[in-house]
């Protein structure tokens, strides 16, 4: 069993923001496994479940704001008894140019409030799929930048990155993490 978390903020006003790249990605991946989301209030998230090649996959989108994402993660992790090594968090990263992807296990949160919240409840020994959204320019505030919508060209580049993640997601199910890491670059 694996748990895949897409980070973002709830609400239509955030739907196409840089900070919601995790929601955008997880919707694409869940859709390719013919799985749709439903709200689970007891977990503070939208959840989709499926089985692929005998392995259960649980997808979640926290319904809390980003800085409280850990509430959803700990609820689902505890209920399903999922080990941290089987948790994959998809999130935006301003330290990567738009469309660039990096995969890593463990490490710091890089100032990302969603990761800080998750680290606070389960530690940091889980997998991260970092999707680049670029850095703010001209002294723009980081919070304003990530809470603004993508420019059209940026969004197209971000969607190409999401396609690379989705197209290679079976490698995660096969526990071929190094191969996944190399294919999504």
Swiss-Prot record:
It comes from the Bacteria. TRNA binds at residues 14, 65, 67, 113. Coiled coil: none annotated. It is found in: Cytoplasm. SUPFAM superfamilies: Peptidyl-tRNA hydrolase-like. InterPro entries: Pept_tRNA_hydro, Pept_tRNA_hydro_CS, Pept_tRNA_hydro_sf. One of its GO terms (biological process) is rescue of stalled ribosome. Keywords: Cytoplasm, Hydrolase, RNA-binding, tRNA-binding. Monomer. HAMAP family: Pept_tRNA_hydro_bact (MF_00083). Hydrolyzes ribosome-free peptidyl-tRNAs (with 1 or more amino acids incorporated), which drop off the ribosome during protein synthesis, or as a result of ribosome stalling. Catalyzes the release of premature peptidyl moieties from peptidyl-tRNA molecules trapped in stalled 50S ribosomal subunits, and thus maintains levels of free tRNAs and 50S ribosomes. This is Peptidyl-tRNA hydrolase. It comes from Rickettsia felis (strain ATCC VR-1525 / URRWXCal2) (Rickettsia azadi). The gene is pth.
């Amino acid at each position: 069993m694996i748990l895949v978390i897409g980070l973002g903020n709830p609400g239509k006003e955030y739907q196409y923001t840089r900070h919601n790249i995790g929601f955008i990605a997880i919707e694409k991946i869940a859709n390719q496994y013919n799985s749709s989301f439903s709200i689970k209030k007891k977990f503070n998230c939208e959840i989709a479940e499926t089985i692929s090649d005998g392995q259960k996959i649980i997808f979640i989108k926290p319904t809390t704001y980003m800085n409280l994402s850990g509430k959803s993660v700990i609820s689902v992790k505890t209920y399903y008894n999922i080990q941290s090594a089987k948790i994959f968090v998809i999130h935006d990263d301003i330290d990567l140019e738009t469309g660039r992807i990096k995969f890593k296990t463990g490490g710091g949160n890089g100032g990302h409030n969603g990761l800080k919240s998750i680290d606070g409840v389960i530690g940091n020994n889980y997998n991260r799929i970092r999707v680049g959204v670029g850095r703010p320019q001209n002294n723009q505030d980081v919070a304003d930048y990530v809470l603004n919508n993508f420019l059209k060209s940026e969004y197209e580049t971000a969607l190409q990155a999401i396609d690379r993640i989705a197209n290679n997601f079976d490698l995660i199910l096969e526990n071929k993490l190094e191969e996944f890491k190399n294919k999504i670059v």
